Protein backbone atom coordinates (compact mmCIF):
# COMPACT_ATOMS: atom_id res chain seq x y z
CA UNK A 1 0.00 0.00 0.00
CA UNK A 2 1.46 3.43 -0.89
CA UNK A 3 2.34 5.55 2.12
CA UNK A 4 -0.18 8.23 3.04
CA UNK A 5 2.45 10.55 4.54
CA UNK A 6 5.98 10.95 3.24
CA UNK A 7 7.35 12.19 6.56
CA UNK A 8 6.04 11.84 10.09
CA UNK A 9 7.27 14.09 12.91
CA UNK A 10 6.55 12.99 16.49
CA UNK A 11 7.13 15.56 19.25
CA UNK A 12 6.99 14.48 22.90
CA UNK A 13 6.27 17.32 25.32
CA UNK A 14 7.85 15.44 28.20
CA UNK A 15 5.43 14.98 31.14
CA UNK A 16 2.58 17.11 29.72
CA UNK A 17 -0.26 14.83 30.88
CA UNK A 18 -3.98 15.58 30.60
CA UNK A 19 -5.69 14.00 33.60
CA UNK A 20 -5.47 10.96 35.84
CA UNK A 21 -5.39 7.58 34.12
CA UNK A 22 -7.93 4.89 35.08
CA UNK A 23 -5.29 3.06 37.14
CA UNK A 24 -3.90 6.20 38.85
CA UNK A 25 -4.95 4.77 42.22
CA UNK A 26 -2.10 2.26 41.89
CA UNK A 27 0.59 4.92 41.46
CA UNK A 28 1.82 7.24 44.18
CA UNK A 29 3.65 10.42 45.11
CA UNK A 30 5.07 10.98 48.57
CA UNK A 31 4.46 14.14 50.56
CA UNK A 32 7.85 15.83 50.96
CA UNK A 33 7.25 16.73 54.62
CA UNK A 34 5.12 13.88 55.98
CA UNK A 35 6.32 11.18 53.53
CA UNK A 36 2.70 10.06 53.27
CA UNK A 37 1.95 8.15 50.06
CA UNK A 38 -0.78 9.89 48.04
CA UNK A 39 -2.11 8.20 44.91
CA UNK A 40 -2.21 10.02 41.57
CA UNK A 41 -6.01 10.00 41.22
CA UNK A 42 -6.34 13.78 41.39
CA UNK A 43 -3.41 14.61 39.11
CA UNK A 44 -4.02 16.67 35.96
CA UNK A 45 -0.97 18.42 34.55
CA UNK A 46 -2.53 20.54 31.79
CA UNK A 47 -5.82 20.95 33.64
CA UNK A 48 -4.29 22.26 36.84
CA UNK A 49 -1.86 24.61 35.07
CA UNK A 50 -4.77 25.94 33.01
CA UNK A 51 -6.81 26.44 36.17
CA UNK A 52 -4.18 27.79 38.58
CA UNK A 53 -2.00 29.90 36.28
CA UNK A 54 -3.92 30.09 33.05
CA UNK A 55 -2.59 29.13 29.63
CA UNK A 56 -2.46 31.39 26.58
CA UNK A 57 -1.84 28.87 23.80
CA UNK A 58 -3.66 30.08 20.67
CA UNK A 59 -1.93 27.64 18.35
CA UNK A 60 -2.57 24.53 20.42
CA UNK A 61 -6.12 25.81 20.97
CA UNK A 62 -6.71 26.08 17.21
CA UNK A 63 -5.35 22.58 16.74
CA UNK A 64 -7.87 21.31 19.29
CA UNK A 65 -6.19 20.94 22.70
CA UNK A 66 -9.41 22.14 24.29
CA UNK A 67 -11.40 19.51 22.38
CA UNK A 68 -9.61 16.54 23.93
CA UNK A 69 -12.19 14.47 25.89
CA UNK A 70 -12.22 15.32 29.60
CA UNK A 71 -14.61 15.13 32.54
CA UNK A 72 -14.38 18.93 32.83
CA UNK A 73 -13.20 21.38 30.14
CA UNK A 74 -9.84 23.11 30.39
CA UNK A 75 -10.39 26.44 32.17
CA UNK A 76 -8.39 28.68 29.85
CA UNK A 77 -8.23 26.62 26.64
CA UNK A 78 -11.67 26.65 24.99
CA UNK A 79 -12.67 24.00 22.50
CA UNK A 80 -12.21 25.02 18.86
CA UNK A 81 -15.38 25.11 16.77
CA UNK A 82 -13.46 23.56 13.89
CA UNK A 83 -10.20 22.09 15.22
CA UNK A 84 -7.37 22.09 12.70
CA UNK A 85 -6.12 18.70 13.89
CA UNK A 86 -7.38 15.32 14.99
CA UNK A 87 -7.13 15.07 18.77
CA UNK A 88 -7.62 12.49 21.50
CA UNK A 89 -5.98 11.22 24.67
CA UNK A 90 -4.12 7.96 25.17
CA UNK A 91 -3.88 5.54 28.09
CA UNK A 92 -0.74 3.69 29.15
CA UNK A 93 -0.91 -0.08 29.60
CA UNK A 94 2.66 -0.60 30.84
CA UNK A 95 3.35 -0.91 34.56
CA UNK A 96 5.36 2.26 34.99
CA UNK A 97 5.20 6.04 34.73
CA UNK A 98 8.83 6.75 33.89
CA UNK A 99 10.38 8.20 30.76
CA UNK A 100 11.74 4.95 29.32
CA UNK A 101 8.51 3.04 29.86
CA UNK A 102 6.46 5.82 28.26
CA UNK A 103 8.66 6.22 25.20
CA UNK A 104 9.12 2.48 24.72
CA UNK A 105 5.37 1.94 24.85
CA UNK A 106 4.80 4.78 22.39
CA UNK A 107 7.10 2.79 20.08
CA UNK A 108 5.06 -0.36 20.59
CA UNK A 109 6.39 -2.24 23.62
CA UNK A 110 4.29 -3.49 26.53
CA UNK A 111 6.37 -3.27 29.73
CA UNK A 112 4.55 -5.43 32.28
CA UNK A 113 7.53 -5.86 34.62
CA UNK A 114 8.35 -2.40 35.95
CA UNK A 115 11.95 -1.31 36.14
CA UNK A 116 13.19 -1.67 39.74
CA UNK A 117 13.52 1.49 41.80
CA UNK A 118 15.70 2.06 44.83
CA UNK A 119 13.81 4.06 47.48
CA UNK A 120 16.42 3.15 50.11
CA UNK A 121 19.35 4.02 47.86
CA UNK A 122 21.82 1.75 46.11
CA UNK A 123 23.47 -1.26 47.79
CA UNK A 124 26.85 -0.90 49.39
CA UNK A 125 28.55 -3.43 47.13
CA UNK A 126 27.64 -1.36 44.05
CA UNK A 127 28.95 1.84 45.65
CA UNK A 128 32.21 0.09 46.56
CA UNK A 129 32.69 -1.06 42.96
CA UNK A 130 32.18 2.51 41.72
CA UNK A 131 34.67 3.81 44.28
CA UNK A 132 37.25 1.23 43.25
CA UNK A 133 36.85 2.03 39.55
CA UNK A 134 36.79 5.82 39.92
CA UNK A 135 39.32 6.23 42.71
CA UNK A 136 36.85 8.59 44.37
CA UNK A 137 34.78 8.19 47.51
CA UNK A 138 30.98 8.50 47.40
CA UNK A 139 28.94 10.75 49.70
CA UNK A 140 26.74 8.14 51.38
CA UNK A 141 24.24 10.69 52.74
CA UNK A 142 23.20 11.54 49.16
CA UNK A 143 22.46 7.91 48.28
CA UNK A 144 18.67 8.10 48.31
CA UNK A 145 15.82 9.60 46.26
CA UNK A 146 16.70 13.28 45.90
CA UNK A 147 15.74 16.32 43.87
CA UNK A 148 18.55 17.01 41.42
CA UNK A 149 18.77 20.67 42.37
CA UNK A 150 18.50 19.99 46.11
CA UNK A 151 21.22 17.34 46.09
CA UNK A 152 23.82 19.72 44.66
CA UNK A 153 22.71 22.46 47.04
CA UNK A 154 23.19 20.09 49.97
CA UNK A 155 26.38 18.32 48.89
CA UNK A 156 27.95 20.51 46.20
CA UNK A 157 30.09 22.48 48.68
CA UNK A 158 31.42 19.23 50.14
CA UNK A 159 32.20 17.88 46.67
CA UNK A 160 34.13 21.05 45.85
CA UNK A 161 36.28 20.44 48.93
CA UNK A 162 36.73 16.66 48.80
CA UNK A 163 36.14 15.55 45.20
CA UNK A 164 33.71 12.88 46.37
CA UNK A 165 31.01 11.65 44.00
CA UNK A 166 27.37 12.62 44.50
CA UNK A 167 25.29 9.56 43.62
CA UNK A 168 21.53 9.68 44.09
CA UNK A 169 18.30 8.27 42.69
CA UNK A 170 14.66 9.30 42.35
CA UNK A 171 11.27 7.67 42.12
CA UNK A 172 12.34 6.71 38.59
CA UNK A 173 14.61 3.70 37.86
CA UNK A 174 17.72 5.88 37.54
CA UNK A 175 21.15 6.27 39.10
CA UNK A 176 22.39 9.83 38.76
CA UNK A 177 25.91 11.11 39.31
CA UNK A 178 26.31 14.83 39.89
CA UNK A 179 29.77 16.30 39.36
CA UNK A 180 31.02 19.88 39.54
CA UNK A 181 32.95 20.55 36.34
CA UNK A 182 35.78 22.31 38.22
CA UNK A 183 36.43 19.14 40.21
CA UNK A 184 35.40 16.27 37.94
CA UNK A 185 35.63 16.82 34.20
CA UNK A 186 32.82 15.80 31.90
CA UNK A 187 35.14 13.23 30.32
CA UNK A 188 35.83 11.61 33.70
CA UNK A 189 32.15 11.74 34.67
CA UNK A 190 31.11 10.07 31.42
CA UNK A 191 33.69 7.31 31.90
CA UNK A 192 32.35 6.61 35.39
CA UNK A 193 28.79 6.51 34.07
CA UNK A 194 29.79 4.16 31.26
CA UNK A 195 31.36 1.84 33.82
CA UNK A 196 28.26 1.90 36.03
CA UNK A 197 26.13 1.16 32.96
CA UNK A 198 28.30 -1.86 32.14
CA UNK A 199 27.79 -3.45 35.57
CA UNK A 200 24.05 -2.77 35.93
CA UNK A 201 22.64 -4.43 32.83
CA UNK A 202 19.90 -7.05 32.83
CA UNK A 203 21.18 -10.23 34.48
CA UNK A 204 23.85 -8.40 36.48
CA UNK A 205 22.00 -8.77 39.78
CA UNK A 206 21.14 -5.07 39.94
CA UNK A 207 19.37 -3.69 36.88
CA UNK A 208 18.98 0.07 36.52
CA UNK A 209 16.93 1.70 33.78
CA UNK A 210 19.20 4.67 33.15
CA UNK A 211 22.53 5.97 34.38
CA UNK A 212 22.54 9.77 34.12
CA UNK A 213 25.55 12.08 34.15
CA UNK A 214 24.63 15.42 35.76
CA UNK A 215 27.45 17.96 35.46
CA UNK A 216 27.01 21.34 37.11
CA UNK A 217 28.91 24.59 37.68
CA UNK A 218 28.82 27.61 39.97
CA UNK A 219 29.46 28.43 43.60
CA UNK A 220 27.76 27.39 46.81
CA UNK A 221 24.28 28.88 46.88
CA UNK A 222 24.33 29.42 43.13
CA UNK A 223 24.95 26.04 41.53
CA UNK A 224 23.50 25.40 38.08
CA UNK A 225 23.25 22.18 36.09
CA UNK A 226 24.74 22.40 32.60
CA UNK A 227 23.71 21.00 29.23
CA UNK A 228 26.29 18.22 29.57
CA UNK A 229 23.72 15.73 30.78
CA UNK A 230 24.13 12.26 29.29
CA UNK A 231 21.76 9.31 29.67
CA UNK A 232 23.04 5.75 29.47
CA UNK A 233 19.95 3.63 28.96
CA UNK A 234 19.23 -0.02 28.44
CA UNK A 235 18.46 -1.13 24.92
CA UNK A 236 14.77 -1.94 24.43
CA UNK A 237 13.92 -5.53 25.36
CA UNK A 238 12.21 -6.16 22.02
CA UNK A 239 12.12 -4.62 18.57
CA UNK A 240 10.39 -1.23 18.55
CA UNK A 241 8.78 0.41 15.55
CA UNK A 242 11.72 2.84 15.58
CA UNK A 243 14.07 -0.09 15.02
CA UNK A 244 11.76 -1.65 12.41
CA UNK A 245 11.82 1.59 10.42
CA UNK A 246 15.61 1.71 10.58
CA UNK A 247 15.95 -1.91 9.46
CA UNK A 248 13.56 -1.23 6.57
CA UNK A 249 15.90 1.50 5.31
CA UNK A 250 13.63 4.36 6.33
CA UNK A 251 15.45 7.47 7.55
CA UNK A 252 15.01 8.09 11.28
CA UNK A 253 16.03 11.33 13.00
CA UNK A 254 16.25 11.84 16.77
CA UNK A 255 16.17 15.20 18.54
CA UNK A 256 17.01 15.63 22.23
CA UNK A 257 17.32 12.61 24.48
CA UNK A 258 15.49 10.19 22.16
CA UNK A 259 18.79 8.59 21.14
CA UNK A 260 19.64 8.06 24.82
CA UNK A 261 16.21 6.64 25.71
CA UNK A 262 16.52 3.99 22.99
CA UNK A 263 20.28 3.53 23.48
CA UNK A 264 20.67 4.63 19.82
CA UNK A 265 18.81 1.51 18.60
CA UNK A 266 16.82 2.50 15.52
CA UNK A 267 18.32 5.99 15.20
CA UNK A 268 20.04 6.75 11.89
CA UNK A 269 20.62 10.48 12.32
CA UNK A 270 21.00 12.05 15.77
CA UNK A 271 20.46 15.81 15.76
CA UNK A 272 22.06 16.05 19.20
CA UNK A 273 21.08 16.94 22.74
CA UNK A 274 19.03 20.06 23.41
CA UNK A 275 20.46 22.93 25.42
CA UNK A 276 16.84 23.74 26.26
CA UNK A 277 13.44 23.19 24.67
CA UNK A 278 13.70 26.15 22.32
CA UNK A 279 17.01 24.76 21.10
CA UNK A 280 15.21 21.43 20.69
CA UNK A 281 12.67 23.09 18.40
CA UNK A 282 15.56 24.63 16.45
CA UNK A 283 17.10 21.17 16.02
CA UNK A 284 13.78 19.73 14.87
CA UNK A 285 13.44 22.54 12.31
CA UNK A 286 16.99 21.88 11.14
CA UNK A 287 16.09 18.23 10.55
CA UNK A 288 12.81 19.09 8.82
CA UNK A 289 14.51 21.47 6.40
CA UNK A 290 17.35 19.14 5.40
CA UNK A 291 17.17 18.67 1.63
CA UNK A 292 18.04 14.99 1.98
CA UNK A 293 15.16 14.37 4.44
CA UNK A 294 12.55 13.68 1.78
CA UNK A 295 10.88 10.69 3.45
CA UNK A 296 11.06 9.18 6.92
CA UNK A 297 10.45 9.76 10.60
CA UNK A 298 11.66 12.34 13.13
CA UNK A 299 11.29 11.78 16.87
CA UNK A 300 11.77 14.72 19.25
CA UNK A 301 11.80 14.93 23.05
CA UNK A 302 11.44 18.30 24.79
CA UNK A 303 12.42 17.58 28.38
CA UNK A 304 12.30 20.97 30.14
CA UNK A 305 8.60 20.68 31.01
CA UNK A 306 9.51 17.68 33.14
CA UNK A 307 13.05 18.30 34.34
CA UNK A 308 12.92 22.04 35.01
CA UNK A 309 9.32 22.55 36.08
CA UNK A 310 7.39 19.34 36.79
CA UNK A 311 9.73 17.76 39.33
CA UNK A 312 10.33 21.16 40.91
CA UNK A 313 6.58 21.73 41.19
CA UNK A 314 6.88 25.07 39.41
CA UNK A 315 3.42 25.84 38.01
CA UNK A 316 4.42 29.26 36.68
CA UNK A 317 7.54 28.02 34.91
CA UNK A 318 5.71 25.04 33.47
CA UNK A 319 2.93 27.20 32.08
CA UNK A 320 5.40 29.65 30.54
CA UNK A 321 7.27 26.74 28.91
CA UNK A 322 4.05 25.46 27.32
CA UNK A 323 3.30 28.96 26.01
CA UNK A 324 6.84 29.26 24.63
CA UNK A 325 6.42 25.99 22.75
CA UNK A 326 3.03 27.12 21.48
CA UNK A 327 4.72 30.21 20.08
CA UNK A 328 7.03 28.03 17.98
CA UNK A 329 4.29 25.88 16.47
CA UNK A 330 3.78 28.15 13.41
CA UNK A 331 7.45 27.62 12.50
CA UNK A 332 7.07 23.85 12.75
CA UNK A 333 3.90 23.91 10.65
CA UNK A 334 5.54 26.19 8.06
CA UNK A 335 8.38 23.65 7.72
CA UNK A 336 5.93 20.84 6.97
CA UNK A 337 5.38 19.57 3.45
CA UNK A 338 1.88 18.93 2.14
CA UNK A 339 2.23 15.21 2.81
CA UNK A 340 3.89 15.56 6.24
CA UNK A 341 2.18 14.41 9.43
CA UNK A 342 2.86 16.06 12.80
CA UNK A 343 1.95 14.34 16.07
CA UNK A 344 2.36 16.12 19.41
CA UNK A 345 2.03 14.06 22.58
CA UNK A 346 3.65 13.31 25.97
CA UNK A 347 5.14 10.28 27.76
CA UNK A 348 3.55 10.56 31.24
CA UNK A 349 2.31 13.29 33.56
CA UNK A 350 4.17 15.45 36.08
CA UNK A 351 1.57 17.74 37.64
CA UNK A 352 3.49 20.74 39.06
CA UNK A 353 0.65 21.45 41.48
CA UNK A 354 0.63 17.94 42.94
CA UNK A 355 2.02 16.54 46.17
CA UNK A 356 5.55 15.12 46.03
CA UNK A 357 8.09 15.49 43.25
CA UNK A 358 7.48 12.41 41.10
CA UNK A 359 5.74 11.82 37.78
CA UNK A 360 1.97 11.41 37.82
CA UNK A 361 0.02 8.58 36.17
CA UNK A 362 -2.02 10.35 33.51
CA UNK A 363 -3.50 10.14 30.07
CA UNK A 364 -1.37 11.86 27.45
CA UNK A 365 -2.77 14.30 24.87
CA UNK A 366 -2.39 13.57 21.17
CA UNK A 367 -2.61 16.18 18.42
CA UNK A 368 -2.39 14.92 14.82
CA UNK A 369 -1.96 17.57 12.10
CA UNK A 370 -1.41 17.60 8.36
CA UNK A 371 -1.91 20.39 5.84
CA UNK A 372 -3.86 17.87 3.76
CA UNK A 373 -6.61 17.24 6.33
CA UNK A 374 -10.14 18.24 5.31
CA UNK A 375 -12.30 18.04 8.46
CA UNK A 376 -10.35 16.81 11.48
CA UNK A 377 -12.30 15.56 14.49
CA UNK A 378 -11.95 14.01 17.93
CA UNK A 379 -10.76 10.39 17.75
CA UNK A 380 -11.72 7.65 20.25
CA UNK A 381 -9.53 7.36 23.34
CA UNK A 382 -6.69 4.94 22.61
CA UNK A 383 -3.38 3.69 23.97
CA UNK A 384 0.20 4.98 23.77
CA UNK A 385 1.30 2.37 21.21
CA UNK A 386 -1.41 3.40 18.76
CA UNK A 387 1.04 6.11 17.71
CA UNK A 388 3.70 3.65 16.57
CA UNK A 389 1.14 1.27 15.04
CA UNK A 390 -0.01 4.18 12.87
CA UNK A 391 3.56 5.08 11.92
CA UNK A 392 4.28 1.43 11.13
CA UNK A 393 1.26 1.08 8.86
CA UNK A 394 2.12 4.29 7.03
CA UNK A 395 5.62 3.06 6.21
CA UNK A 396 4.53 -0.56 5.57
CA UNK A 397 6.43 -2.18 8.42
CA UNK A 398 4.99 -4.47 11.07
CA UNK A 399 3.86 -2.95 14.34
CA UNK A 400 5.66 -3.99 17.52
CA UNK A 401 4.09 -5.83 20.48
CA UNK A 402 0.98 -3.70 20.83
CA UNK A 403 -1.01 -0.79 19.41
CA UNK A 404 -3.84 -0.22 16.93
CA UNK A 405 -3.34 2.02 13.92
CA UNK A 406 -5.66 4.98 13.37
CA UNK A 407 -4.17 5.75 9.93
CA UNK A 408 -7.42 5.02 8.09
CA UNK A 409 -9.24 7.62 10.22
CA UNK A 410 -6.96 10.42 9.01
CA UNK A 411 -8.51 11.97 5.92
From Swiss-Prot:
A Pfam family it matches: Metalloenzyme
Cofactor: Mn(2+)
Main location: cytoplasm
EC numbers on record: 5.4.2.7
Gene3D superfamilies to which the protein is assigned, alphabetical: Alkaline Phosphatase, subunit A, Phosphopentomutase
Function comment: Isomerase that catalyzes the conversion of deoxy-ribose 1-phosphate (dRib-1-P) and ribose 1-phosphate (Rib-1-P) to deoxy-ribose 5-phosphate (dRib-5-P) and ribose 5-phosphate (Rib-5-P), respectively.
Protein name per its UniProtKB record: Phosphopentomutase
Organism listed in the record: Lactococcus lactis subsp. cremoris (strain MG1363)
Amino acid sequence: MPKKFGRIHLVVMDSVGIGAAPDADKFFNHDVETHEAINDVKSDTIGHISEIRGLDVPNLQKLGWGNIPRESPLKTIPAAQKPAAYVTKLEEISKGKDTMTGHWEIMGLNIQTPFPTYPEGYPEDLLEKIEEFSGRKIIREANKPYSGTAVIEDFGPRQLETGELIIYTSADPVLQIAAHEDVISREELYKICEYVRSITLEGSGIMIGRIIARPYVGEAGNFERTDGRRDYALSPFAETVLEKLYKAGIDTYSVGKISDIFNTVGVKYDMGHNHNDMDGVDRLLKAMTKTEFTEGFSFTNLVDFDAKYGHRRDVEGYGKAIEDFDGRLPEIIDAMKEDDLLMITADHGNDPSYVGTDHTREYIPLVIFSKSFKEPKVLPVGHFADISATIAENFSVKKAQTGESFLDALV
